[in-house]
Amino acid sequence: MDKNYDRIIFPERSYDFVAPREQFVENMVSYFPKEEKAIISYMDLLDQVATNSRSYFTNKALPGILGTITYPFMTRKFFSYSDRTTFDVLSGLTSDQHLIGVLTGQWGDHGLPPKQSSFAMHAMVARHYLDGGNYPTGSSRSIAETISDLIESHDGVLMVNAGVDEIKIHNGTAVSVIMENGDEIEADTIISNAGVVNTIDRMLKNGNGHSRLIDRLEKVEQTKSYVCLHIGLNKSADELGITNTNLWIYPSYDHDKNVQDYTNNPEADFPVVYVSFPSAKDQAWDENHAGYATMEAITLSTWDWYTKWQDLSWKNRGQEYEDAKTKLSDRILDIVFEQVPGIRHAMAYKELSTPLTVRDLANYQKGEMYGISHTPDRFRQRWLRPKSDIKNLFYT
Protein backbone atom coordinates (compact mmCIF):
# COMPACT_ATOMS: atom_id res chain seq x y z
CA MET A 1 0.00 0.00 0.00
CA ASP A 2 0.94 3.67 -0.16
CA LYS A 3 3.13 4.93 2.66
CA ASN A 4 0.20 7.02 3.91
CA TYR A 5 -1.77 4.02 5.17
CA ASP A 6 -4.32 5.83 7.39
CA ARG A 7 -5.78 9.34 7.56
CA ILE A 8 -7.48 10.34 10.82
CA ILE A 9 -10.10 12.99 10.06
CA PHE A 10 -11.83 15.38 12.46
CA PRO A 11 -14.18 18.26 11.62
CA GLU A 12 -11.48 20.92 11.54
CA ARG A 13 -8.45 19.01 10.24
CA SER A 14 -6.87 15.64 9.43
CA TYR A 15 -3.71 13.74 10.44
CA ASP A 16 -1.77 11.32 8.26
CA PHE A 17 -0.22 8.08 9.52
CA VAL A 18 2.75 7.53 7.23
CA ALA A 19 5.33 4.74 7.08
CA PRO A 20 8.09 4.08 7.91
CA ARG A 21 8.31 4.49 11.65
CA GLU A 22 10.63 7.51 11.47
CA GLN A 23 8.17 9.34 9.23
CA PHE A 24 5.29 8.51 11.55
CA VAL A 25 7.16 10.08 14.47
CA GLU A 26 8.19 13.10 12.41
CA ASN A 27 4.60 13.71 11.36
CA MET A 28 3.23 13.37 14.88
CA VAL A 29 5.81 15.80 16.24
CA SER A 30 4.99 18.28 13.45
CA TYR A 31 1.31 18.07 14.42
CA PHE A 32 2.02 18.32 18.15
CA PRO A 33 5.42 20.04 18.58
CA LYS A 34 4.95 20.53 22.32
CA GLU A 35 4.35 16.80 22.80
CA GLU A 36 7.57 15.38 21.34
CA LYS A 37 8.60 13.77 24.62
CA ALA A 38 5.19 12.10 25.00
CA ILE A 39 5.30 10.85 21.42
CA ILE A 40 8.77 9.32 21.84
CA SER A 41 7.66 7.68 25.09
CA TYR A 42 4.57 6.33 23.35
CA MET A 43 6.69 4.71 20.64
CA ASP A 44 8.85 3.10 23.30
CA LEU A 45 5.77 1.67 25.00
CA LEU A 46 4.63 0.10 21.73
CA ASP A 47 7.96 -1.73 21.55
CA GLN A 48 7.76 -2.83 25.18
CA VAL A 49 4.34 -4.37 24.64
CA ALA A 50 5.60 -6.23 21.57
CA THR A 51 8.61 -7.57 23.46
CA ASN A 52 6.63 -8.74 26.47
CA SER A 53 3.76 -10.16 24.44
CA ARG A 54 6.04 -12.90 23.12
CA SER A 55 6.35 -14.71 26.43
CA TYR A 56 2.65 -14.15 27.18
CA PHE A 57 1.52 -15.82 23.97
CA THR A 58 4.22 -18.48 24.16
CA ASN A 59 2.85 -19.52 27.54
CA LYS A 60 -0.54 -20.14 25.96
CA ALA A 61 1.02 -22.86 23.84
CA LEU A 62 2.83 -24.62 26.68
CA PRO A 63 1.24 -27.88 27.87
CA GLY A 64 -0.12 -28.75 31.30
CA ILE A 65 2.12 -28.38 34.32
CA LEU A 66 4.85 -26.59 32.36
CA GLY A 67 2.42 -23.84 31.37
CA THR A 68 1.13 -23.58 34.93
CA ILE A 69 4.56 -23.31 36.55
CA THR A 70 5.86 -20.73 34.08
CA TYR A 71 2.64 -18.70 33.88
CA PRO A 72 3.37 -16.09 36.59
CA PHE A 73 6.75 -14.92 35.33
CA MET A 74 5.96 -15.32 31.61
CA THR A 75 2.91 -13.05 31.86
CA ARG A 76 3.74 -10.53 34.59
CA LYS A 77 5.30 -7.82 32.41
CA PHE A 78 2.66 -8.15 29.71
CA PHE A 79 -0.09 -7.75 32.31
CA SER A 80 1.44 -4.45 33.41
CA TYR A 81 0.26 -3.14 30.01
CA SER A 82 -2.78 -5.29 29.27
CA ASP A 83 -4.39 -4.59 32.66
CA ARG A 84 -4.62 -0.86 31.88
CA THR A 85 -6.89 0.84 29.39
CA THR A 86 -5.46 2.67 26.42
CA PHE A 87 -6.74 5.99 27.73
CA ASP A 88 -5.19 5.40 31.15
CA VAL A 89 -1.75 4.74 29.68
CA LEU A 90 -1.83 7.64 27.23
CA SER A 91 -3.10 10.01 29.91
CA GLY A 92 0.06 9.18 31.84
CA LEU A 93 2.09 10.50 28.90
CA THR A 94 0.15 13.61 27.92
CA SER A 95 -2.79 15.79 28.89
CA ASP A 96 -3.37 16.78 25.26
CA GLN A 97 -6.75 15.22 24.45
CA HIS A 98 -6.31 15.92 20.74
CA LEU A 99 -3.09 13.91 20.66
CA ILE A 100 -4.80 11.04 22.48
CA GLY A 101 -7.68 11.21 20.02
CA VAL A 102 -5.30 11.04 17.07
CA LEU A 103 -3.11 8.22 18.42
CA THR A 104 -6.24 6.15 19.12
CA GLY A 105 -7.74 6.94 15.71
CA GLN A 106 -7.44 3.29 14.65
CA TRP A 107 -9.57 1.99 17.52
CA GLY A 108 -11.99 0.48 15.01
CA ASP A 109 -9.26 -1.99 14.04
CA HIS A 110 -9.82 -3.81 17.34
CA GLY A 111 -13.32 -2.66 18.19
CA LEU A 112 -13.13 -0.69 21.46
CA PRO A 113 -12.59 3.03 22.14
CA PRO A 114 -9.64 4.01 24.38
CA LYS A 115 -11.37 4.08 27.77
CA GLN A 116 -12.54 0.49 27.28
CA SER A 117 -9.74 -1.19 25.33
CA SER A 118 -6.67 -2.86 26.74
CA PHE A 119 -3.54 -0.84 25.97
CA ALA A 120 -1.83 -4.06 24.94
CA MET A 121 -4.35 -4.53 22.13
CA HIS A 122 -3.98 -0.92 21.01
CA ALA A 123 -0.20 -1.22 21.02
CA MET A 124 -0.10 -4.43 18.99
CA VAL A 125 -2.36 -2.96 16.31
CA ALA A 126 -0.66 0.44 16.16
CA ARG A 127 2.87 -0.98 16.05
CA HIS A 128 2.21 -3.51 13.31
CA TYR A 129 1.35 -0.67 10.90
CA LEU A 130 4.54 1.31 11.46
CA ASP A 131 6.35 -0.34 8.55
CA GLY A 132 3.33 0.25 6.32
CA GLY A 133 0.12 -1.46 5.32
CA ASN A 134 -0.10 -4.52 3.07
CA TYR A 135 -2.85 -6.03 0.95
CA PRO A 136 -2.95 -9.42 -0.79
CA THR A 137 -2.62 -9.41 -4.58
CA GLY A 138 -5.90 -10.74 -5.91
CA SER A 139 -7.80 -9.57 -2.80
CA SER A 140 -8.52 -11.58 0.34
CA ARG A 141 -9.76 -14.60 -1.63
CA SER A 142 -6.17 -15.26 -2.73
CA ILE A 143 -5.29 -16.07 0.90
CA ALA A 144 -7.94 -18.80 1.03
CA GLU A 145 -6.94 -20.12 -2.39
CA THR A 146 -3.27 -20.32 -1.41
CA ILE A 147 -4.05 -22.05 1.88
CA SER A 148 -6.42 -24.50 0.20
CA ASP A 149 -3.75 -25.52 -2.30
CA LEU A 150 -1.36 -26.26 0.56
CA ILE A 151 -3.94 -28.29 2.47
CA GLU A 152 -4.90 -30.37 -0.56
CA SER A 153 -1.26 -30.95 -1.51
CA HIS A 154 -0.91 -32.76 1.84
CA ASP A 155 -3.96 -34.96 1.22
CA GLY A 156 -6.29 -32.65 3.10
CA VAL A 157 -9.93 -32.37 2.06
CA LEU A 158 -11.88 -29.11 2.03
CA MET A 159 -15.66 -29.07 2.28
CA VAL A 160 -17.67 -25.94 1.50
CA ASN A 161 -21.30 -25.17 2.36
CA ALA A 162 -20.92 -27.83 5.04
CA GLY A 163 -22.34 -26.59 8.32
CA VAL A 164 -21.33 -28.16 11.64
CA ASP A 165 -24.09 -29.04 14.08
CA GLU A 166 -22.11 -30.55 16.94
CA ILE A 167 -18.68 -31.51 18.20
CA LYS A 168 -19.28 -34.92 19.73
CA ILE A 169 -17.71 -35.57 23.12
CA HIS A 170 -17.28 -39.07 24.57
CA ASN A 171 -15.88 -39.56 28.09
CA GLY A 172 -14.42 -36.05 28.09
CA THR A 173 -12.73 -36.43 24.71
CA ALA A 174 -13.68 -34.80 21.40
CA VAL A 175 -14.13 -37.72 18.99
CA SER A 176 -16.03 -36.47 15.96
CA VAL A 177 -17.84 -33.66 14.20
CA ILE A 178 -21.51 -34.08 13.31
CA MET A 179 -22.55 -32.13 10.23
CA GLU A 180 -25.89 -30.40 9.70
CA ASN A 181 -26.90 -33.13 7.24
CA GLY A 182 -26.23 -35.81 9.87
CA ASP A 183 -22.89 -37.05 8.55
CA GLU A 184 -20.34 -37.83 11.27
CA ILE A 185 -16.62 -37.27 10.71
CA GLU A 186 -14.34 -38.93 13.24
CA ALA A 187 -10.99 -37.34 14.07
CA ASP A 188 -8.13 -37.68 16.54
CA THR A 189 -7.80 -33.89 16.74
CA ILE A 190 -10.53 -31.30 16.24
CA ILE A 191 -9.65 -27.63 15.81
CA SER A 192 -12.41 -25.02 15.84
CA ASN A 193 -11.86 -21.60 14.30
CA ALA A 194 -15.49 -20.59 14.81
CA GLY A 195 -14.58 -18.59 17.92
CA VAL A 196 -14.99 -19.70 21.51
CA VAL A 197 -18.53 -18.35 21.81
CA ASN A 198 -19.78 -20.25 18.77
CA THR A 199 -17.79 -23.36 19.71
CA ILE A 200 -18.98 -23.57 23.29
CA ASP A 201 -22.47 -22.16 22.93
CA ARG A 202 -23.50 -23.81 19.67
CA MET A 203 -21.31 -26.85 18.95
CA LEU A 204 -20.90 -28.37 22.40
CA LYS A 205 -24.14 -29.80 23.73
CA ASN A 206 -25.18 -30.21 27.36
CA GLY A 207 -23.09 -32.50 29.53
CA ASN A 208 -19.37 -33.27 29.30
CA GLY A 209 -18.45 -30.20 31.34
CA HIS A 210 -20.49 -27.91 29.11
CA SER A 211 -21.98 -25.93 32.02
CA ARG A 212 -18.48 -25.05 33.27
CA LEU A 213 -17.54 -23.73 29.85
CA ILE A 214 -20.75 -21.70 29.64
CA ASP A 215 -19.86 -20.12 32.98
CA ARG A 216 -16.52 -19.09 31.53
CA LEU A 217 -18.21 -17.31 28.65
CA GLU A 218 -19.78 -14.97 31.21
CA LYS A 219 -16.28 -13.63 31.93
CA VAL A 220 -15.87 -12.27 28.41
CA GLU A 221 -18.09 -10.10 26.26
CA GLN A 222 -18.81 -10.07 22.56
CA THR A 223 -17.85 -7.06 20.48
CA LYS A 224 -20.39 -4.64 19.07
CA SER A 225 -21.59 -5.09 15.55
CA TYR A 226 -21.30 -2.91 12.46
CA VAL A 227 -22.89 -1.96 9.17
CA CYS A 228 -20.93 -1.83 5.93
CA LEU A 229 -21.94 0.08 2.80
CA HIS A 230 -20.48 -1.70 -0.22
CA ILE A 231 -20.03 0.66 -3.18
CA GLY A 232 -19.32 -0.17 -6.82
CA LEU A 233 -17.99 2.55 -9.12
CA ASN A 234 -18.04 2.65 -12.93
CA LYS A 235 -14.71 4.42 -13.18
CA SER A 236 -11.23 3.34 -12.14
CA ALA A 237 -9.53 4.56 -8.99
CA ASP A 238 -7.05 6.50 -11.13
CA GLU A 239 -9.85 8.23 -13.03
CA LEU A 240 -11.52 9.19 -9.75
CA GLY A 241 -8.30 10.27 -8.07
CA ILE A 242 -8.71 7.64 -5.35
CA THR A 243 -5.66 6.45 -3.41
CA ASN A 244 -5.54 3.40 -1.12
CA THR A 245 -5.22 5.41 2.10
CA ASN A 246 -7.83 4.34 4.68
CA LEU A 247 -10.00 7.17 6.02
CA TRP A 248 -11.12 7.30 9.66
CA ILE A 249 -13.76 10.01 9.98
CA TYR A 250 -14.79 11.24 13.46
CA PRO A 251 -17.19 13.88 14.85
CA SER A 252 -14.81 14.75 17.72
CA TYR A 253 -11.60 13.67 19.45
CA ASP A 254 -13.46 12.00 22.35
CA HIS A 255 -14.00 8.52 20.93
CA ASP A 256 -15.68 7.09 24.02
CA LYS A 257 -18.22 9.91 24.14
CA ASN A 258 -18.86 9.53 20.42
CA VAL A 259 -19.62 5.83 20.91
CA GLN A 260 -21.79 6.41 23.97
CA ASP A 261 -23.80 9.18 22.30
CA TYR A 262 -24.50 7.04 19.25
CA THR A 263 -25.29 3.92 21.25
CA ASN A 264 -27.83 5.92 23.26
CA ASN A 265 -29.29 7.61 20.19
CA PRO A 266 -28.87 6.16 16.68
CA GLU A 267 -29.80 9.56 15.24
CA ALA A 268 -26.65 11.08 16.78
CA ASP A 269 -23.47 11.57 14.76
CA PHE A 270 -21.77 8.36 13.70
CA PRO A 271 -18.94 7.66 16.19
CA VAL A 272 -16.73 6.68 13.25
CA VAL A 273 -17.02 6.13 9.53
CA TYR A 274 -14.18 4.02 8.18
CA VAL A 275 -13.72 4.27 4.41
CA SER A 276 -11.46 1.90 2.49
CA PHE A 277 -10.76 1.25 -1.17
CA PRO A 278 -10.18 -2.50 -1.74
CA SER A 279 -9.73 -2.29 -5.51
CA ALA A 280 -7.15 0.49 -5.20
CA LYS A 281 -5.15 -1.74 -2.84
CA ASP A 282 -5.19 -4.77 -5.13
CA GLN A 283 -2.34 -4.74 -7.66
CA ALA A 284 -4.13 -7.35 -9.79
CA TRP A 285 -7.50 -5.57 -9.89
CA ASP A 286 -7.20 -4.09 -13.39
CA GLU A 287 -6.42 -7.48 -14.92
CA ASN A 288 -10.09 -8.45 -14.73
CA HIS A 289 -11.91 -5.27 -13.71
CA ALA A 290 -10.33 -2.39 -15.65
CA GLY A 291 -12.42 0.77 -15.56
CA TYR A 292 -14.15 -0.06 -12.28
CA ALA A 293 -13.46 0.45 -8.58
CA THR A 294 -14.86 -0.53 -5.20
CA MET A 295 -15.24 1.16 -1.82
CA GLU A 296 -16.45 0.21 1.63
CA ALA A 297 -17.78 2.51 4.34
CA ILE A 298 -18.22 1.01 7.80
CA THR A 299 -19.72 2.34 11.01
CA LEU A 300 -20.63 0.96 14.42
CA SER A 301 -23.97 -0.69 15.09
CA THR A 302 -25.84 -2.62 17.75
CA TRP A 303 -27.63 -5.95 17.48
CA ASP A 304 -30.59 -4.68 19.51
CA TRP A 305 -31.53 -2.24 16.76
CA TYR A 306 -32.26 -5.15 14.40
CA THR A 307 -33.97 -7.72 16.60
CA LYS A 308 -37.42 -6.95 15.14
CA TRP A 309 -36.23 -8.53 11.88
CA GLN A 310 -34.08 -11.33 13.30
CA ASP A 311 -36.57 -14.12 12.54
CA LEU A 312 -37.03 -13.09 8.91
CA SER A 313 -34.84 -14.66 6.25
CA TRP A 314 -32.12 -12.95 4.25
CA LYS A 315 -33.52 -10.90 1.33
CA ASN A 316 -37.04 -11.29 2.76
CA ARG A 317 -37.17 -8.85 5.68
CA GLY A 318 -39.78 -6.49 4.29
CA GLN A 319 -40.07 -2.88 3.25
CA GLU A 320 -39.50 -1.38 6.71
CA TYR A 321 -36.10 -3.07 6.87
CA GLU A 322 -35.21 -1.92 3.36
CA ASP A 323 -36.30 1.64 4.17
CA ALA A 324 -34.14 1.62 7.31
CA LYS A 325 -31.16 0.45 5.23
CA THR A 326 -31.76 3.17 2.65
CA LYS A 327 -31.93 5.89 5.30
CA LEU A 328 -28.74 4.66 6.93
CA SER A 329 -26.97 4.32 3.57
CA ASP A 330 -27.84 7.90 2.67
CA ARG A 331 -26.47 9.15 6.00
CA ILE A 332 -23.22 7.27 5.45
CA LEU A 333 -22.93 8.58 1.88
CA ASP A 334 -23.30 12.16 3.11
CA ILE A 335 -20.15 11.63 5.18
CA VAL A 336 -18.32 9.82 2.37
CA PHE A 337 -19.11 12.51 -0.22
CA GLU A 338 -17.57 15.17 2.02
CA GLN A 339 -14.23 13.34 1.89
CA VAL A 340 -14.41 11.69 -1.55
CA PRO A 341 -16.65 14.01 -3.61
CA GLY A 342 -15.47 12.65 -6.96
CA ILE A 343 -17.39 9.39 -6.60
CA ARG A 344 -20.86 10.95 -6.41
CA HIS A 345 -21.59 10.57 -10.14
CA ALA A 346 -19.69 7.30 -10.59
CA MET A 347 -21.74 5.11 -8.26
CA ALA A 348 -23.12 2.09 -10.09
CA TYR A 349 -23.97 -0.06 -7.08
CA LYS A 350 -24.51 0.19 -3.34
CA GLU A 351 -25.65 -2.34 -0.78
CA LEU A 352 -25.70 -2.11 3.01
CA SER A 353 -24.90 -5.13 5.15
CA THR A 354 -26.27 -5.09 8.70
CA PRO A 355 -25.68 -7.15 11.87
CA LEU A 356 -28.26 -9.59 10.48
CA THR A 357 -26.14 -10.01 7.36
CA VAL A 358 -23.10 -10.75 9.51
CA ARG A 359 -25.08 -13.35 11.43
CA ASP A 360 -26.38 -15.04 8.29
CA LEU A 361 -23.17 -15.02 6.27
CA ALA A 362 -20.43 -15.16 8.92
CA ASN A 363 -22.27 -17.04 11.70
CA TYR A 364 -21.60 -14.47 14.42
CA GLN A 365 -24.87 -14.75 16.30
CA LYS A 366 -25.12 -11.09 17.28
CA GLY A 367 -23.35 -9.73 14.23
CA GLU A 368 -20.13 -9.22 16.17
CA MET A 369 -17.28 -7.34 14.58
CA TYR A 370 -14.35 -9.21 16.16
CA GLY A 371 -15.71 -11.97 18.39
CA ILE A 372 -14.55 -11.26 21.95
CA SER A 373 -13.95 -7.68 23.13
CA HIS A 374 -10.33 -6.73 23.77
CA THR A 375 -10.80 -5.44 27.30
CA PRO A 376 -8.18 -5.71 30.04
CA ASP A 377 -10.19 -8.60 31.55
CA ARG A 378 -10.04 -10.56 28.31
CA PHE A 379 -6.26 -10.95 28.56
CA ARG A 380 -6.59 -12.27 32.13
CA GLN A 381 -8.68 -15.25 30.99
CA ARG A 382 -6.14 -18.05 31.12
CA TRP A 383 -8.59 -20.52 29.60
CA LEU A 384 -8.45 -18.56 26.33
CA ARG A 385 -5.67 -20.66 24.88
CA PRO A 386 -5.36 -23.11 21.96
CA LYS A 387 -5.87 -26.25 24.08
CA SER A 388 -9.38 -26.43 25.46
CA ASP A 389 -10.50 -28.18 28.66
CA ILE A 390 -11.75 -31.02 26.48
CA LYS A 391 -9.17 -33.55 25.33
CA ASN A 392 -8.36 -33.38 21.60
CA LEU A 393 -10.33 -30.14 21.09
CA PHE A 394 -8.42 -26.98 20.24
CA TYR A 395 -9.35 -23.37 19.48
CA THR A 396 -7.57 -21.17 16.97
Predicted regions and their residues:
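N-terminal FAD cofactor-binding segment of flavoenzymes
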Residues: 1-5, 94
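Rossmann-like flavin
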Residues: 11-116
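Surface-exposed helix-capping loop/turn segments at secondary-structure junctions
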Residues: 55-62, 152-158, 170, 238-239, ...
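Helical element adjacent to the flavin cofactor pocket in flavoenzyme catalytic cores
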Residues: 91, 123-183, 188
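A glycine-rich dinucleotide-binding beta-alpha-beta segment and adjacent secondary-structure elements
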Residues: 96-110, 270-274, 333-396
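Active-site-adjacent "gating/activation" loops or surface patches in catalytic cores
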Residues: 102-134, 388-391
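Mid-domain catalytic core of redox enzymes
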Residues: 165-289
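C-terminal segments that line or cap access tunnels to active or ligand-binding sites in enzymes
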Residues: 234-356
